Regions:
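Residues embedded in well-ordered beta-strands within globular domains across many folds
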Residues: 57-59, 259, 282, 483
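Phosphate/ATP-binding catalytic cores across multiple sugar-kinase/actin-like superfamilies
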Residues: 238-258
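Short glycine/proline- and acidic residue-enriched helix-loop micro-motifs
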Residues: 225-239
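Active-site pocket-shaping loop/turn-to-helix segments
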Residues: 30-41, 238
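Short beta-strand-loop/turn "lid" adjacent to the catalytic site in phosphate-handling enzymes
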Residues: 43-78, 87-90
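Flexible beta->alpha loop and helix N-cap segments adjacent to enzyme active/binding sites
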Residues: 3-35, 77, 83-85, 90-208, ...
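Short, surface-exposed connector motifs at secondary-structure boundaries
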Residues: 53, 254-257, 278-281
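Glycine-rich phosphate-binding loops at beta-strand->alpha-helix junctions
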Residues: 62-65, 257-273
């Protein structure tokens, strides 16, 4: 049996498939080495041909049209936000989607309306039409720290002046299956909230302002308007971000266990605030737009009584070998000696976070790590680096003992890991279980040398590029060394 899910709306296009018991996934950005890349139906068909999938049953995430605002499925076409809900490998009675925008059926002359999220209690949907959280955070671009993003600022001005309609542009993009000259700056707009997530930690929150915004008739729009006419300092950025954390809690009833998805679900600071407020959000690495193909496929799997899958990997280039014990020991020595080391093993991860297959690794005890690693990554100075730690020892270092996908902030409990401790004392960490044997063994060897079972872990890519999906791409990154399978390459760029 061949089942296929397509996620081809606006950005982060992907294809997911079930082929005779095997699960396959490919993301356009990895194939074309263009971040958040959009690729249309022609590309998806070429992938299916490569996979030798013939006459499949196909479901797709899309923007539905019609008169019924509660409609989530039309044949095998799924509402975009409903595809987010369906992307979870587990079924939850309550599901909450917080995203930028989608369009869905509406009882008006256009038979469509824009909305920014979805709350589902059982089978009952409620659309969220409030001003989108990513747009609420947009005024951060006027802060001094983003002075280098002049092109992005002009883009936002065009949106505010209504000389650009993102919805109309997206419809044209899908119709023509071609990106245009606006694409590069649109990609930057997608990444702005993630960069703000790191910057806000340097500011002090004005809780009185947050309370005033929350108690206004239109909280999100009020917060946006008041900050968008100023040149916010880092304290206002922190205040704006804190507002976003709290407004999500205000918008939904307390939910102790729920499925959580959409682009905003990648925000580890907001996720932590939900946890601290008594919520239990269940987030998966593909909970963003890149996982909508998985949601569409899950819709078909449910119909055919096939169990949903949870161990998704990229269909990309893999090494011919696995690292031996000798190679793992050598890599650990390089890390202990403060070398910036690439780690390319198996298939790449699905989702925007590197989890030990496509990673750049470094010594977490080195207080100069950010400057050293940023010679390669070239990221803004305020953005933190994550960590990978042995799961059976994570409780010694972080207040969240199990967190396998870098989707929630933890408080750091140990002072000896400055490389992965953000200015606010937090870390986006990944816990590595013993069954992830190759990566776990590397952490074990690192521990023998630096007394900490941990590495700094950041994705194997350069600024503005997606995570590497070929060995050639990986070798082009100017690292001190890179381990690909069982081979170590040193000083390739000296």
């Amino acid at each position: 049996m061949h089942l296929v899910g397509l996620g081809l709306t606006m950005h982060d296009s992907s294809v997911a498939a079930y082929k005779d018991g095997k699960f396959l996934y490919r993301k356009a950005e990895r194939q074309f080495s263009k971040k958040h890349f959009y690729a249309g139906l022609s590309w998806a068909e070429s992938v299916l041909k490569e996979w030798d999938i013939n006459n499949p049953v196909i479901a797709k995430s899309t923007w539905l049209k019609g008169r019924d605002p509660d409609q989530l499925v039309d044949g095998f076409d799924l509402d975009h936000h409903y595809a987010h809900v369906m992307s979870s490998p587990k079924k939850y009675h309550v599901n909450y989607v917080v995203d930028a925008l989608s369009t869905g059926p509406a009882d008006n002359e256009n038979e469509q309306e824009v909305y920014t999220g979805l709350l589902m209690m059982g089978e009952t949907p409620r659309r969220i039409k409030d001003f989108p959280i990513p747009s609420v955070l947009r005024p951060a671009v006027w802060a001094q720290q983003f002075d280098h993003e002049e092109e992005l600022r002009k883009f936002f001005i065009s949106i505010q002046n209504q000389t650009i309609s993102i919805t109309d542009w997206a419809k044209k993009l899908i119709e023509t299956e071609q990106v245009d000259e606006m694409w590069p700056v649109f990609v930057k707009s997608i990444d702005l909230p993630g960069k703000t997530m790191g910057l806000q930690s340097y500011g002090r929150v004005d809780n009185k302002t947050v309370d005033r915004w929350l108690n206004s008739p239109f909280p999100r729009y009020t917060a946006f308007c008041e900050t968008n006419v100023t040149r916010p300092d880092v304290h206002m950025v922190a205040t704006l971000h804190s507002f976003c954390e709290r407004v999500l809690q205000k918008d939904v009833p307390p939910m102790h266990d729920f499925g959580y998805s959409g682009g905003v679900a990648q925000n580890v600071v907001i996720n932590r605030s939900l946890l601290d407020a008594g919520y239990k959000p269940n987030v998966y690495p593909w909970a963003y737009d890149g996982g909508c193909s998985i949601g569409a496929l899950n819709y078909l799997l449910d119909k055919y009584n096939i169990e949903r899958y949870s161990d998704w990997v990229q269909d990309d280039q893999t090494p011919d070998t696995e690292p031996s014990t000798r190679t793992i020991k050598k890599v650990a020595e390089l890390i202990a000696n403060n070398k910036v080391v690439g780690w390319y093993q198996g298939n790449g991860e699905v989702g925007p976070r590197a989890l030990g297959n496509r990673s750049i690794l470094f010594n977490p005890t080195n207080k100069h790590a950010k400057q050293i690693v940023n010679r390669v990554k070239q990221r803004e100075w305020w953005r933190p680096f994550g960590a990978s730690v042995k799961e059976d020892q994570a409780h010694r270092f972080f207040d969240i003992p199990v967190s396998r996908h870098m989707l929630i902030n933890s408080n750091v409990l140990y002072s000896g890991i400055p490389a992965v401790t953000h200015v606010d004392g937090t870390c986006r960490h990944q816990t590595v279980p013993e069954e992830n044997s190759i990566y776990y063994n590397l952490l074990d060897e690192v521990e023998k040398l630096i007394d900490v079972p941990m590495v700094l872990n950041t994705s194997l890519n350069l600024r503005g590029k997606p995570i590497c999906s070929t060995i050639t791409e990986a070798k082009q990154i100017p690292l001190d060394a890179i381990c690909i399978g069982d081979e170590i390459y040193e000083n390739m760029h000296s």
